[in-house]
């Protein structure tokens, strides 16, 4: 990134510091990536200072920052989702689980932000009760676990669908599928995402039309009707059930690693489109998606998603980047004291390959992955396999 941009140090959870930096550098437009600044009102802070920014307000961001708000909102506006129960105490949660109303498996979600780790799919009562203890009694996620949403388990295939909204209109950005579990074969604990591919082969034109009409349109209209017009990226996490697509979750941002596989497929002047959304006017904007496929593989630090190692030198990036169709998206990286690039987070980077089909994109992605080395590096070796079936 340093080759094409000025990298500025910034505490991402401080709206005042972000606004001060935008003013200092004369930013024409700020695009918010993570959910934490949105939850703390960075868009409201910028707007009050007359600074252009793309993202939902703090109130609109509740679609992601509060599972209880999102479920109640969907109920109010007829958006299809799983049946649910909200518990405000561990005792109530245990009592509801014991009632057997939803049976097992059952899904438990911490109400607030938990870095993608606040969801437990419990196959039995013992696992469900352990999740209640962890979230509500042991306070694993702090205040995010003040409430727990218990959801009826939905059976089907998952996909993610993305749009950009100006508060009234939307521009579709297509679909993707991600791999949340840490190990091959979707084994192990959930993570923020170990890889993704786009577009989803499940999302044909008919399904896309239903998603836009039955899910996206009611959400955008509902937010506007409730006084919180939604501007920015909306990520719809969906389950394709026999009864149709149902919402599992919303993200009020593009999502990671989904953004990395969708962005390389967007053709045209993306900057103009983003500026139009931020200004509340997408009337003359549309997006053309390339007739290609992408596969993105996350390189994770040893120990992730639990306690992980950092400060490990990274090698092989130049060789990986020379492979046709490869883009390297940095995440948890930093410059060490000796000027070498080192690991600085759980998910270190995403290697994205574009190809004519999924097989070519997958082959290129893993060819590039095998060029990169750092101590303890962990990758899944099956990212994209689902698209080949």
Where are these regions (language model features)?
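A conserved helix-loop-beta module that forms one wall/lid of the active-site cleft
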Residues: 54-118
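Solvent-exposed alpha-helices and their adjacent loops that cap or buttress functional pockets
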Residues: 1-2, 24, 54, 76-78, ...
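Internal nucleotide-binding/catalytic subdomain
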Residues: 118-259
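Generic C-terminus detector
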Residues: 333-338, 342-389
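ATP-binding N-terminal substructure of ATP-dependent carboxylate-amine bond-forming enzymes
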Residues: 1-58
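Active-site "cap" helix and flanking loop/linker of ATP-utilizing ligase/carboxylase catalytic domains
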Residues: 212-234, 251-323, 336
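Short acidic-hydrophobic, aromatic-tinged amphipathic segments that line or gate anion-handling sites
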Residues: 7-13, 85-89, 122
């Amino acid at each position: 990134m340093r080759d094409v941009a000025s990298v500025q140090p910034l505490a991402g959870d401080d709206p005042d510091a972000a606004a001060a930096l935008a003013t200092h550098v004369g930013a024409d437009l700020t695009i918010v990536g993570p959910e934490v600044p949105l939850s703390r009102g960075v868009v409201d802070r910028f707007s009050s200072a007359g600074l252009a920014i793309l993202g939902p307000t703090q109130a609109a961001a509740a679609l992601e920052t509060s599972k209880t708000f999102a479920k109640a909102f969907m109920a109010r506006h007829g958006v299809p989702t799983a049946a649910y129960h909200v518990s405000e105490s561990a005792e109530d949660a245990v009592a509801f689980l014991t009632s057997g109303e939803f049976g097992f498996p059952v899904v438990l979600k911490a109400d607030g932000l938990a870095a993608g780790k606040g969801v437990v799919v419990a196959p039995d009562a013992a696992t469900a009760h352990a999740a209640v203890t962890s979230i509500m009694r042991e306070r694993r996620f702090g205040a995010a676990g003040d409430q727990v949403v218990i959801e009826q388990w939905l059976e089907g295939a998952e996909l993610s669908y993305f749009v950009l909204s100006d508060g009234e209109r939307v521009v579709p950005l297509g679909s993707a599928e991600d791999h949340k579990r840490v190990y091959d074969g979707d084994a192990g604990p959930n993570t923020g995402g170990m890889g993704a591919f786009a577009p989803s082969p499940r999302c044909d034109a008919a399904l896309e039309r239903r998603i836009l009409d039955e899910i996206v349109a009611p959400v955008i209209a509902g937010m506007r009707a409730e006084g919180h017009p939604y501007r920015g990226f909306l990520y719809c996490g969906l389950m394709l059930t026999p009864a149709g697509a149902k919402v599992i979750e919303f993200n009020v941002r593009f999502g990671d690693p989904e953004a990395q596989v969708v962005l390389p497929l967007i053709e045209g002047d993306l900057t103009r489109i983003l500026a139009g959304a931020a200004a509340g006017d997408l009337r003359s904007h549309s997006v053309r998606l390339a007739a290609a496929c992408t596969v993105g593989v996350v390189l994770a630090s040893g120990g992730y998603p639990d306690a992980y190692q950092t400060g490990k030198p990274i090698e092989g990036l130049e060789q990986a980047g020379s492979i046709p169709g490869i883009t390297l998206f940095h995440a948890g990286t930093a410059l060490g004291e000796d000027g070498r690039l080192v690991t600085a987070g759980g998910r270190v980077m995403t290697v994205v390959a574009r190809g004519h089909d999924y097989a070519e994109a997958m082959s290129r992605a893993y060819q590039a992955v095998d060029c990169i080395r750092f101590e303890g590096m962990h990758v899944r070796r099956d990212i994209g396999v689902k698209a080949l079936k």
